[in-house]
Amino acid sequence: MKHILFISPTTSMDNGAEKSVYYLMKYLIQLGHTVINVTHAIGGEPQDKHEQLYKMIGVKNYYLPTIKWWWPDAPGGEILNREEATSYYRQNVQVIAEIIDKNEIDLVISNTVNVFQGAIAASCQKVPHFWLIHEFPKNEFAYYADKIDFIEEYSSELFSVTGELNNFLTPLFNKKVHPFISYTDQETKDLKKGNQVRIISVGRLTEGKNQLELIKAYKALNRLDIELVFIGGWDSKYKAICDEYIHENKLQKNVKFLGNLDNPWEEVTDRDICVFPSSMETFGLVYVEAILRGLPVILSDNLGHLTAFEIFSAGQIYKLGDIEELVTKLEQVIESFRDFSDRAQLDVERLRSLYTPEVAYKEILNGINHLENTGHQNTNLSHIKELLTLNMHPTRLERYARLISNMATKIRHKLRL
């Protein structure tokens, strides 16, 4: 049995990449492996909840302080002080290397292309490293297209979500990119009873998730007797755009935002229609969660949704951007809701037989079971480890100057806003 260290991209469970690998960790522990996870510190109640969630499945978490956890040019905030951010990057590589030694780690796995510290630490310690890719190098993740050589160089094995993403990435790498299916636990608990039909969309409110398209379709549907409910946190700027449209069209009483919930499916009833209008997905894990609960689903035809749809053949597909077609699909499901609901519930047993961790993670599990054949990354950084991990200790005067510089940078940033 192996000691496996994961590097996680976020300290939350509001995205498919985290959910999928959480259940991979859970399954690996069931098989007898030891699993440890490293992510960035966010403090407070959210971190406490996160830690408790992982303790429930037997995973020890390390929470590392940082200015920015992802690559400097990745989405997720601007770095105001590059020197300080670089110091944290270097410090965290050192801490991860120490965790590898202390826990006798056999394998490091980086979840998403957005985190790179584990790849460097693994190379410094001469430990195999797997990289799991969930993102197309397009739109908000286009930044990593010029990092493909690094990703390949510092990976013993590469894996990506199956289907369109894997097809897209395969010609970009010299190494084989092994496929895997994003997995989530199969909920066997019955949905609570609802009083009336509602339209539900689960997931973070973002431009990529494209909820404004659903709001526009809802206005065109002109069924104010049916609520539109969004479950999930939000990006403030995109939420403001949605709010503006809702107010302009006097939909405030009919459109609800419930925010981030620990278990969003506890809010969903057996009278709900799930709609997922995302413009870009790598798989569509929330779609799978919905159909496994026997809910009628309408989803856009983005590449990730199509990958999942090809596996499960459940739900209704509409052409992304075609609001008129989305309205037609909504009208059809509302008009014949009982028929659509009955068919969805009868299909659950078939869907569950297609969706098991053994099948979803077959290639990753095979790589772990034959780790002795994978070797290390192409590049060995152990000879220059100290250059990459040791920070100079500043004098008191230098610390004071850095503090003044940070304050000035923050003031300039606020003045630009």
Where are these regions (language model features)?
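A conserved mid-protein helix/loop that constitutes part of the nucleotide-sugar donor-binding site
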Residues: N15-Y23, V197, T206-A220, A240
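A charged, aromatic-enriched C-terminal amphipathic alpha-helix characteristic of glycosyltransferases
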Residues: K189, R338-T395
